[in-house]
């Protein structure tokens, strides 16, 4: 029989009171009865950090590991080396940057890494649009003013703008980035731009009313609002540093619901405090959970606002949790049945090789460059 380890976040009393919070340790993605009825074992924990964590102890003899972007259990090369029985790593959600994919390819004959592709793209896209509006309309300081018992229209309005007539650009135009652009179309923005190595079709560009910019700095210089919708990998880690942020328009807004490590948190906080960035918002942090002294918890613009940060929640609405719980079960069922008939789009690593175009192309390019250098 198979041991399944799930690293999920603690929902506390909320997880106990709301069974639809499937991504919590209280509700375990709805998997326990289904697995135990088949004779399998499910171990669930939220203890994932520090020496001798439950995650580390239980991983050693687990055959399947379930992790989540909202409370990531980092599958480093060192951890994978100790996981002698591990065959399948499932992300309940999307994004497998918490897994050392090179090590997964080489461990135990190749660990399959899969995620529930598409399960929360609508949820994240809606959150992006909400965050843009919250920042541009200066909602948070205005709401805080009311809660404090004050009434000062001018104080709120002096940093409030319309989204109409603004230039908005997305870094990445995959499943989420494209949906963000589609949701922005009715707002009559001056222009919708995107930066991505792979262009949309001419038909999609015409339908959405967007335009590709081949150079990232060129796009940033034009945008009033920039939203990050690309995956985290070696080329995007720390991408938005002090130098790149300086290329953005003074007084622009930056939204990040992709991954916290794509930005340098200290540089974003500095740009916000100086007013170079009028606002920063999103739900992704590095590390996660964010420590109490994380600079993006407290950084504000010179007007006393511009911070729209929340916990990592954009992709874990109750509707999204239904989808990624069902998708996680389907992936595990495919493994347990021996059929391994996974949805191709869910596979990140399979059979000791990359199964996704972007990762595969990137790794092959690195290998080719190394071979050429040594020749």
Curated annotation (Swiss-Prot):
It catalyses: formate + NAD(+) = CO2 + NADH. The record marks 259, 312 as: Important for catalytic activity. GO terms for biological process: formate catabolic process. Its main location: cytoplasm. Its EC number is 1.17.1.9. NAD(+) binds at residues 175-176, 196, 231-235, 257, 283, 312-315, 358. The keyword NAD applies. PROSITE patterns: D_2_HYDROXYACID_DH_1, D_2_HYDROXYACID_DH_2, D_2_HYDROXYACID_DH_3. InterPro entries: D-isomer_2_OHA_DH_cat_dom (IPR006139), D-isomer_DH_CS (IPR029753), D-isomer_DH_CS1 (IPR029752), D-isomer_DH_NAD-bd (IPR006140), FDH_NAD-dep (IPR033689), NAD(P)-bd_dom_sf (IPR036291). It is found in: Cytoplasm. GO terms for molecular function: formate dehydrogenase (NAD+) activity; NAD binding; oxidoreductase activity, acting on the CH-OH group of donors, NAD or NADP as acceptor. SUPFAM superfamilies: Formate/glycerate dehydrogenase catalytic domain-like, NAD(P)-binding Rossmann-fold domains. Substrate binds at residues 94, 120. Keywords: Cytoplasm, NAD, Oxidoreductase. One of its GO terms (cellular component) is cytosol. Catalyzes the NAD(+)-dependent oxidation of formate to carbon dioxide. Formate oxidation is the final step in the methanol oxidation pathway in methylotrophic microorganisms. Has a role in the detoxification of exogenous formate in non-methylotrophic organisms. Belongs to the D-isomer specific 2-hydroxyacid dehydrogenase family. FDH subfamily. Homodimer. NCBIfam families: PRK07574.1 (NF005750). This is Formate dehydrogenase. The gene is fdh.
